[in-house]
Amino acid sequence: MADIQAEKAFQKQQVSFKNRFQLKASKGKEGIRYYKNIGLGYRTPKDAIEGTYIDKKCPFTSDVSIRGAILRGTVISTKMRRTLVVRRNYLHYIKKYNRFEKRHSNIPAHVSPAFNVKEGDSVTIGQCRPLSKTVRFNVIKHDISAASKKQFKAF
């Protein structure tokens, strides 16, 4: 949340929700802050309501809508700015041998400054419009430290 004005141009919150969602505003010392409830049973984080960050790709404070697939996975990389890589492990059935094999997929997702995500944490990501060349998902829920749970590692 320290990168409030990290860009060269002055950043301000865009208010164009087009009446699709219930628009809410909170008045703070910085002025009026707009946020919305994304629905689907997910709550708006407290940092999105009370924070001062400006992110045009945040599902809670901008006009990005969550639609389509909702997935869960483990964070394996946070090296990109406001983007992380989520690993999803799954089993694939091989009919010839009547057995399953372990597979995985890496999904890049945008993370809002409202979440303080570290590697190894479990996150829920929701599909949205394409945000860049490879990013089509947005973090909508953060569960701290999935390392304590039993899971299979990279093979």
From Swiss-Prot:
**GO term, biological process aspect, one:** translation
Check the record and name the SUPFAM superfamilies matching this protein. Answer: Nucleic acid-binding proteins
For this UniProt entry, what's an example GO CC term? cytosolic small ribosomal subunit
Residues that bear N-acetylalanine: A2
| GO MF term list | structural constituent of ribosome
User: Which InterPro entries does the annotation name?
Assistant: NA-bd_OB-fold, Ribosomal_uS17, Ribosomal_uS17_arc/euk, Ribosomal_uS17_CS, Ribosomal_uS17_N
Q: Which Gene3D superfamilies match?
A: 2.40.50.1000
Q: Does the keyword Protein biosynthesis apply?
A: no
Cross-referenced PANTHER family, in alphabetical order? 40S RIBOSOMAL PROTEIN S11 FAMILY MEMBER, 40S RIBOSOMAL PROTEIN S11-RELATED
Entry-linked NCBIfam families: uS17_arch
Protein family: Belongs to the universal ribosomal protein uS17 family.
The identity of this protein, by name, is Small ribosomal subunit protein uS17
Q: Supply the source organism for this entry.
A: Dictyostelium discoideum
